[in-house]
Design a protein with these regions (language model features):
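Residues that mark the start of a beta-strand
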Residues: 2, 26-28, 160
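Short Gly/Pro-enriched turn/cap motifs at secondary-structure boundaries
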Residues: 7, 18-19, 52-58, 107-111
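Residue-level recognition of beta-strand termini and adjacent short loop/turns
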Residues: 8-10, 23
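Glycine-rich beta-strand-centered segment in the early N-terminal region that forms part
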Residues: 20-34, 47-91, 130-132
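Cysteine-cluster motifs in flexible loop/terminal segments that predominantly coordinate metals
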Residues: 37, 72, 83-130
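Cytochrome P450 core scaffold surrounding the K-helix E-X-X-R motif
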Residues: 39-41
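Residue-level marker of beta-strand positions
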Residues: 60, 77-78, 92, 118, ...
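Mid-domain Rossmann-like dinucleotide-binding core that forms the NAD(H)/NADP(H) cofactor-binding site
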Residues: 132-192
Length: 192
């Protein structure tokens, strides 16, 4: 299979390796779409904190389920997944704050990601496509970040929300804050 690796800042290389074989508790996915996130841009540019090279980037993904024993999934299913792999054992995980896991492994940041034809992931992070197409599924992760922010801030109809940055997550924040009934103001350094 082909994959793209960021060997060092400012350098992508196209390489080949065998298709990975899923281990117990893992599934094999064929990548169909991938989003380019600010994290990927910063990693490519050499400014992403806690990052080591070489690394296969990519965590905003849409895929086809190929192989594994995940319950409720059939080969050919359209899927995406949660790219934040937590340990389940640390104090944060035990308290339900898996996003604060002290041992978190972010797919495409701490471990190799999805700029590859095929990937294996732990089956517990797999999500059904729910009728979305591959283009839409690649947006699930950034939109989930936006939805989480609006929910965590407990945005109400009486609120005025300032969104700083009108990239994909910012656009998601705008829409979710409007759904919550808030007045929204947007700032960005890019005029377009």
């Amino acid at each position: 299979m082909k994959f793209i690796v960021c060997e060092k800042p400012q350098e992508f290389i196209l390489k080949e390796k065998p298709i990975p074989e899923p281990k117990d508790g893992e599934v094999l996915l064929k990548i169909k779409r991938i989003g380019i996130c600010g994290t990927d841009i910063h990693a490519f540019g050499g400014t992403q904190p806690y990052f080591e090279y070489p690394r296969i980037l990519g965590h905003e993904l849409a895929a086809e389920y190929i192989k594994g024993n995940a319950k409720g999934f059939t080969p050919g299913d359209k899927v995406t997944f949660i790219p934040y792999f937590n340990c389940g054992k640390c104090v944060a995980c035990r308290n339900g704050l898996t996003n604060c896991c002290v041992n978190i492994k972010v797919f495409g940041v701490h471990i190799d990601g999805g700029m590859a034809e095929y990937v294996t992931i732990p089956e517990q992070y797999l999500l059904h496509g729910q009728g979305l197409d591959y283009d839409q599924l690649a947006l699930v992760e950034p939109l989930a970040i936006a939805a989480h922010g609006v929910r965590r801030a407990a945005v109400k109809p009486t609120d005025t929300v300032l969104v700083m940055g009108a990239g994909p997550i910012g656009i998601g924040l705008i829409q979710f804050a409007k759904i919550a009934g808030a007045k929204v103001i947007v700032m960005d350094i890019n005029e377009y």
